[in-house]
């Protein structure tokens, strides 16, 4: 993310990218992990609470290496939220809800950012303020990243929350589950290679763009959009 902005050499774009990266690392990622912790707590598991993860403090959720990678290239990770599914009131559905909470927080936050952008754009269209246009660009940038991470995490493949959601619908003793657990290290390497080469990013970006357009349309409705 920052690397792409630096390559443009445009000061305003670089400033917006720096602000968006900081917002992503210190707001979006902590909210994602907090959502997992909150959902687990609501399902009866006090593991996140006892681990100090039921908080929005970035220090509890940001992984140093993952945070740096997110800022630089737009892909990384936070500290995994510890949960014990055995404590859930309903183990199967509890796992689904807890896994879905993280990506859902990213999508809802992205929608909120797009709504704020729509408000600022409506005001700037009247006043013609360059500062307001820059603020709108920042929120659009932040929304794009947040929604991209939400869609990415919903992929039903190992390493992402989408896989844990899918697991909740697979029968116990499923061959698919067993195969994934036996080959998870190899799968992680393959997925990381696909992400860093951009092969996996293209379809995720296309789906994210569809979600962004839908949320942008909803956000513009109050202003006659």
Map each language-model feature to its residues.
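Hydrophobic transmembrane alpha-helices and their immediate loop junctions
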Residues: 1-225
């Amino acid at each position: 993310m920052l690397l792409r902005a630096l390559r443009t050499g445009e000061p305003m774009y670089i400033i917006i990218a720096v602000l968006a990266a900081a917002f992503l690392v210190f707001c979006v990622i902590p909210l994602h992990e907090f959502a997992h912790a909150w959902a687990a707590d609501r399902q009866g598991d006090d593991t996140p609470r006892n681990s100090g993860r039921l908080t929005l403090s970035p220090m509890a959720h940001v992984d140093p290496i993952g945070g740096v990678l997110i800022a630089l290239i737009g892909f990384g990770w936070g500290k995994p939220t510890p949960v014990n599914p055995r404590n859930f009131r309903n183990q199967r559905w509890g796992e689904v809800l807890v896994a879905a909470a993280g990506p859902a927080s990213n999508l809802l936050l992205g929608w909120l950012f797009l709504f704020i952008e729509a408000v600022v754009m409506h005001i700037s269209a009247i006043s013609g303020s360059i500062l307001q246009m820059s603020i709108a660009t920042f929120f659009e940038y932040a929304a794009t990243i947040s929604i991209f991470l939400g869609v990415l995490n919903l992929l039903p493949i190992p390493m992402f929350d989408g896989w844990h959601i899918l697991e909740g619908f697979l029968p116990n003793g499923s061959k698919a589950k067993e195969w994934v657990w036996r080959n998870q290290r190899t799968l992680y390497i393959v997925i990381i290679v696909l992400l860093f080469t951009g092969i996996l990013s293209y379809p995720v970006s296309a789906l994210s763009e569809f979600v962004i357009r839908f949320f942008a349309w909803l956000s513009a409705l109050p202003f006659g959009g």
